[in-house]
């Protein structure tokens, strides 16, 4: 089968791999979304790695599914405290290989309803992550930093729970979409919560947070952005990190997904993987999805 495999330098190349064997159900991949975390791993991950975890697929019996690529134990001290993504078992991948392949094996599959379009399963994992993270921050006036694909999911989730949402993004076309989804796009002085959905923007968030406010880090901040913790100290801010999701949030995402306005997708075949990565890096594609 074909797959996008990282070479000795951590760079992607299209290669032929044996059909996956071992534990789990055999899944034929219909589509796999490109996540920012995938792009971050390029040039760094080990040789032979196949990335991709935002997956829409179909089982041998014809059932459509998405998959959970990491699962916590659910019983350890960290899991019981609500920090499932820091569980020791969470580090183990539950799919082999990754989603940028024609097939994979997965130990944890989540059924998808027929009401979803065939490729919409790629949105379940990111939406589940948004739902879990949103549950960890208080309600109020929320600044969403970044109105890209993930930011647009955030806006809709927050508006549905009754929050006033302000969107911040340098691209006018993305702000226009954010406005249509119910967010304010005029700049504001203070907010109760700031959600960082893309690298960069942390200083803009810290400036706008009111005393006692909450900063939710939902994307890895850029390493070269100079940031001071002075605002955290002086305004007594709360800083929360959140990544990944639990089975309960996957199920909730499956139910919620058909009611959302999904971001625009650029669909490419696997043999145009590098092109898709560059479109993502330049901000020319809101969401890149690859099909085998």
Which sequence ranges carry the predicted segments?
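Glycine-rich cofactor phosphate-binding loops and adjacent beta1-alpha1 units
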Residues: 176-236
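Rossmann-fold dehydrogenase core element
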Residues: 214, 226-263
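Mid-domain Rossmann-like dinucleotide-binding core that forms the NAD(H)/NADP(H) cofactor-binding site
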Residues: 116-187
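Glycine-rich beta-strand-centered segment in the early N-terminal region that forms part
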Residues: 20-32, 42-80, 110-115
């Amino acid at each position: 089968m074909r797959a996008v495999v990282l070479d000795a330098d951590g760079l992607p190349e299209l290669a032929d791999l044996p059909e996956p064997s071992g534990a789990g159900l055999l899944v034929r991949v219909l589509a796999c979304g490109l996540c920012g975390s995938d792009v971050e791993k390029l040039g760094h991950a080990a040789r032979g790695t196949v990335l991709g975890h935002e997956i829409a697929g179909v089982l041998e019996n014809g059932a459509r599914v998405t998959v959970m690529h990491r699962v916590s134990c659910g019983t350890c001290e960290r899991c019981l405290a609500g920090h499932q993504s820091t569980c020791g078992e969470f580090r183990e991948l539950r799919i082999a290989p990754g989603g940028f392949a024609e097939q994979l094996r997965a130990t944890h599959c989540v059924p998808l309803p027929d009401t979803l379009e065939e490729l919409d399963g790629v949105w379940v994992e990111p939406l589940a992550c948004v739902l879990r993270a949103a549950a960890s921050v208080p309600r109020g006036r929320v600044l969403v930093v970044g109105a890209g694909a993930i930011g647009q999911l955030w806006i809709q989730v927050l508006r549905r729970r009754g929050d006033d949402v302000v969107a911040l993004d340098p691209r006018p076309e993305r702000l226009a979409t954010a406005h249509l989804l119910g967010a304010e796009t005029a700049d504001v002085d203070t907010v109760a919560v700031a959600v960082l959905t893309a690298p960069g923007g942390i200083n803009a968030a810290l400036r706008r947070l009111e005393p006692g406010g909450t900063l939710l880090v939902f994307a890895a901040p850029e390493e070269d952005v100079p940031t001071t913790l002075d605002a955290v100290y002086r305004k007594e801010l709360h800083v929360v990190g959140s990544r990944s999701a639990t089975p309960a949030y996957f199920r909730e995402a499956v139910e919620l997904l058909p009611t959302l306005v999904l971001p625009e997708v650029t669909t490419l075949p696997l043999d145009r993987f590098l092109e898709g990565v560059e479109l993502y890096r330049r901000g020319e594609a809101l969401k890149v999805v690859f099909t085998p």
